[in-house]
Amino acid sequence: MKNPYFPTALGLYFNYLVHGMGVLLMSLNMASLETLWQTNAAGVSIVISSLGIGRLSVLLFAGLLSDRFGRRPFIMLGMCCYMAFFFGILQTNNIIIAYVFGFLAGMANSFLDAGTYPSLMEAFPRSPGTANILIKAFVSSGQFLLPLIISLLVWAELWFGWSFMIAAGIMFINALFLYRCTFPPHPGRRLPVIKKTTSSTEHRCSIIDLASYTLYGYISMATFYLVSQWLAQYGQFVAGMSYTMSIKLLSIYTVGSLLCVFITAPLIRNTVRPTTLLMLYTFISFIALFTVCLHPTFYVVIIFAFVIGFTSAGGVVQIGLTLMAERFPYAKGKATGIYYSAGSIATFTIPLITAHLSQRSIADIMWFDTAIAAIGFLLALFIGLRSRKKTRHHSLKENVAPGG
């Protein structure tokens, strides 16, 4: 039987195609925005950090309210905020007003997350991990298309702002489509069911688990967000690539992330434990970053762009969220809010740190990301070991119960 929420899911996914473009719009148009705002690269980086603050300011609040009042209002609000950002950012001529519009874009991201992730888990209860990972496919598609769009605009000597207008146009059409779609019922007003008490207790999240998943939300977001913002500049100024070639690194990066999504989604659904992939991908990210820092040559950077896209931006953040949401079966919006609040702290703090590092050396930025990835691997290892320990405990408990 066809899932009645498939059209809704498709619309939700298209929002993240636009979001993928929105994340990179300012960094890929950095030179033009420096002129528009009368600032330098560090100034643009500070404006980029406003997305993280805006996201953090409302994410937990929006997640809690989406559990209570439903997902649709927050998704529509997020789309409206994003369109305001796309139009408004081009109308300002200083970084203060630009910072306000960046803050609005961060809020838009939070509203979308608070409504979309729980909606997909409720629309596809048998495969929530796959449903969430596919979000990353659309984010990566947007990040793949944007460098091509900007390269075309540069080649045709057209206004850089058309890249913002294209994103706004897609979002507007999708808003009209989603307005007519049906959303799955949310659990906010359901009465508690006594027979679910045992299951709820089994899924209760300990303080240690809560802290580890929340910290992983920060680390995983920081690892790939830093690369997505500075990969082009690293290729140009450290590896000695041309501007047009350095921009294409982001397309290579997104090809890697797309391939990872299409490989990971069936693996999680059928054979491999999510925690295994969490540990594996985080470890490979660390090795890739360490290698490119030691050997920042033309071909190494190209290979690095593909590998780091595969391992850090191919759905590992969504895997972490799905694992955490399993600990909050009746409060998925709350889990999303907590997890992505940590991630939004990363999108706020990382640009501030890298703005300082960029004034010294762009190479230092990748060394900094290498250290983050190393911590991420240790954390993923901790999560994986605790998860397997709990799985063995529950299996033993089930085997002993019939004989009790």
Swiss-Prot record:
How does the record classify its membrane topology?
Multi-pass membrane protein
State the species of origin. Escherichia coli (strain K12)
Listed GO CC annotations: membrane; plasma membrane
The superkingdom listed in its UniProt entry is Bacteria
Q: Which Pfam families match?
A: MFS_1
Protein name per Swiss-Prot or TrEMBL: Inner membrane transport protein YdiM
- What SUPFAM superfamilies has UniProt attached to this entry? MFS general substrate transporter
Ranges that cross the membrane: 6-26, 44-64, 85-105, 133-153, 158-178, 207-227, 247-267, 274-294, 297-317, 337-357, 365-385
- Molecular function terms in GO for this entry? transmembrane transporter activity
Name the keywords, alphabetized.
Cell inner membrane, Cell membrane, Membrane, Transmembrane, Transmembrane helix, Transport
Please give the family membership noted in the entry.
Belongs to the major facilitator superfamily.
* Membrane side Periplasmic: residue ranges: 1-5, 65-84, 154-157, 228-246, 295-296, 358-364
Cytoplasmic topological domain residue ranges:
27-43, 106-132, 179-206, 268-273, 318-336, 386-404
Q: Where in the cell is it found?
A: Cell inner membrane
For this protein, the record's InterPro entries field holds: MFS, MFS_dom, MFS_trans_sf, MFS_Transporter, Sugar_transporter_CS
